[in-house]
């Protein structure tokens, strides 16, 4: 009998520990272990990796990651109600699961992990985008992680893989595709979750590139892209006027028409503009 078979069904775990998903924490529990195993497999061979999981809840994906052979899992959970359920998993997989009760935005996972590291998570909806941007914009590259396998609302997932000219194209697409290969690998309907959210979800897999696609300073690129898309319907000469007094000249030097809008500009041109603004 494998370790996962010694654990009670997740619905029993939720009932015995009186767990209910809290909207304030962005929680939706995924209880189908066939689905959590499928998500874990999207992260690839984990046998020689430490895996970081954010917001494990009662531990559905945690079980999947361990059953699929993760060398070790570090799970960061803000909701103390979930800790007893996670402790049961830790007992079944002795030495392979460490649980930290805290806020993922405030904890340095590297103090608890050994490379190589991958990240796999059904991210809490209220912090998922902020965490992704952090993981994509460290000053030094390559990052501490090899790959990200992350569940988002379908709309957010589509923004990560969007192309220029589309309504979904924006800051997330540019930052993700600058430093990673990004693709949607799974879709999940609302009824897969407890409680069912109002929208569908999708799993995005991002693999870190050895080098960014085009040279640019991460902080400058992130700032410029944020400014451009905060006013995406404005011409860039207006949206970016706070970035430099001679912004029209900088745009032209980067090969961008000042009258273009952000959604029309490809990644390579934004990187060229970031380099111009760094001079």
Swiss-Prot record:
It is found in: Cytoplasm. Gene3D superfamilies: Ribosomal RNA adenine dimethylase-like, domain 2, Vaccinia Virus protein VP39. Pfam families: RrnaAD. Its main location: cytoplasm. Signal peptide: none annotated. S-adenosyl-L-methionine binds at residues 28, 30, 55, 77, 103, 122. The keyword tRNA processing does not apply. One of its GO terms (cellular component) is cytosol. Keywords: Cytoplasm, Methyltransferase, RNA-binding, rRNA processing, S-adenosyl-L-methionine, Transferase. Transmembrane segments: none annotated. It catalyses: adenosine(1518)/adenosine(1519) in 16S rRNA + 4 S-adenosyl-L-methionine = N(6)-dimethyladenosine(1518)/N(6)-dimethyladenosine(1519) in 16S rRNA + 4 S-adenosyl-L-homocysteine + 4 H(+). The keyword GTP-binding does not apply. It is an enzyme of class 2 (transferase). GO terms for molecular function: 16S rRNA (adenine(1518)-N(6)/adenine(1519)-N(6))-dimethyltransferase activity; RNA binding. Its EC number is 2.1.1.182. Disulfide bonds: none annotated. Specifically dimethylates two adjacent adenosines (A1518 and A1519) in the loop of a conserved hairpin near the 3'-end of 16S rRNA in the 30S particle. May play a critical role in biogenesis of 30S subunits. Belongs to the class I-like SAM-binding methyltransferase superfamily. rRNA adenine N(6)-methyltransferase family. RsmA subfamily. This is Ribosomal RNA small subunit methyltransferase A. It comes from Ruegeria pomeroyi (strain ATCC 700808 / DSM 15171 / DSS-3) (Silicibacter pomeroyi). The gene is rsmA.
């Amino acid at each position: 009998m494998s370790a996962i078979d010694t654990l009670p069904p997740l619905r029993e775990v939720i009932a015995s520990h009186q767990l209910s998903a809290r909207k304030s924490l962005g929680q939706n529990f995924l209880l189908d272990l066939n689905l959590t195993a499928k998500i874990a497999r999207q992260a690839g061979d984990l046998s020689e990796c430490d895996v970081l999981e954010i917001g494990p809840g009662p531990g559905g994906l945690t079980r999947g990651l361990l059953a699929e052979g993760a060398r070790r899992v570090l799970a960061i959970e803000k909701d103390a109600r979930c800790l007893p359920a996670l402790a049961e998993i830790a007992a079944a997989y002795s030495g392979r699961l460490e649980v930290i009760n805290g806020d993922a935005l405030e904890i340095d996972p590297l103090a608890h992990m050994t490379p190589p590291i991958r990240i796999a998570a059904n991210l809490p909806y209220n912090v998922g985008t902020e965490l992704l941007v952090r993981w994509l914009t460290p000053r030094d590259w390559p990052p501490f992680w090899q790959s990200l396998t992350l569940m988002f609302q379908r709309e957010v997932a589509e923004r990560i893989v969007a192309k220029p000219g589309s309504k979904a194209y924006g800051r997330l697409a540019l930052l993700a595709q600058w430093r990673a290969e990004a693709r949607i690998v799974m879709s999940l309907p609302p009824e897969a979750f407890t409680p069912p959210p109002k929208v569908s979800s999708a799993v995005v897999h991002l693999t870190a590139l050895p080098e960014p696609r085009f040279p640019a300073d991460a902080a400058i690129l992130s700032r410029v892209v944020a400014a451009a898309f905060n006013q995406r319907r404005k011409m860039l000469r207006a949206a970016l006027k706070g970035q430099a007094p001679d912004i029209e000249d900088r745009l032209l030097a980067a090969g961008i028409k000042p009258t273009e809008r952000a959604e029309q500009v490809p990644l390579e041109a934004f990187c060229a503009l970031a380099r111009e603004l760094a001079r």
